[in-house]
Amino acid sequence: MKTLRTLIVEPGMAPRVAEVEDTLEAKQKVVGGLIEPVFPPSHKDDVCLIVNEEGKLCGLPWNRAIRLEDGTAYDIIAGTFLILRAPEDSEDFDSLTDEQIGIYTQMYA
């Protein structure tokens, strides 16, 4: 089974690097429910956040703010999320690069 190198961001915790199986079920297990990809405007590359689609409705704990390009917060994520690449020329998710792990570990620290 193919695995993806990702960052998992849990409420109140520092982001951590993890290998996650490239299956819908594995991603749903990490976020605790149905997944939804989110593409924050502050991200200048092909990275997306995989969040729990119903996190706010289910009352999951607040996690991190999502920001506009100027740094202004415009939304907040509820519950654990993971960060993956979502290349425009593909329908599949991909592993983060070492550079992206550094950038997003710092961004969501």
What is the role of each PLM region?
Residues 1-109:
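Domain-length accessory/inserted modules outside core catalytic folds
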